[in-house]
Amino acid sequence: MTAVADKQKQRAYELDFLRGFALIMMIFMHSAWDIRYEYGVDTFGFLEADWFWAIVHPFFIVIFVGVSGICCTFSKNNLFRGLKLLGVAAGLALATWLITTYLKIYCLIIFNVLAMLAVSILLYSLIEKLEKTAKADPKLVNALIGMAGAFFAALGSKLEWLDYSTDNLIFLPVGFKMNSMPYMADYMPLLPWLGVFLIGCLIGRVCYSERRSLLPAKNKTAKAITAPVEFVGRHSLIIYLVHQPIVYGIMYLIFMLIRRG
């Protein structure tokens, strides 16, 4: 095996591709939402369909969050990663609060996918620390992670059917129903998505224990085809952060020119 092929084999490029593909679809859905609801263009009717919100939308989020859980098992310092991402999420929340409050552009984001992933990564960091300190059997830890993931995912899917409500905003990140839910441009609670993340962690611990790709090295043609999507997957954080203002800005200019014309 050549040095290039060995390097490619060591990096689980299939995870980059899956995360990149999921993020591209999320960007498309955000763009479609802006066009239909922000600019009033009667298109992308699938956004009104129950099947889209019940199947398609969750499907891509499951891929993105699950792969994030898998990748978490590759990291040597999840505490740092989690704190860094939490700082980014807090900065985004502050920025959107200022924009919403003073510019009257209603884009408030309190707890979105970045905050959810940050808390999940920090939780997994704690699990790693406890596992190492207690010298626990990895198989037992895997079983506990799997059961916790399945429980949180199942509980999250049933929350809306439970007869309860609360006024305490401290429960907003968890996913509990709020009596006075603030309008948010994006929202992703811990339930059920922490469960999906933990299931991803389990897959990473079991299937990617050697931290290597499960697929053979790609040839030049396959590499050329998948490289753009993998690039998006490798740089998902920065692309996620900048895509909405960029897309919204481009659309604003386009529709401004159309209306003037």
Write out the residue ranges for each language-model feature:
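Alpha-helical transmembrane segments and their immediate juxtamembrane cytosolic regions
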Residues: 1-261
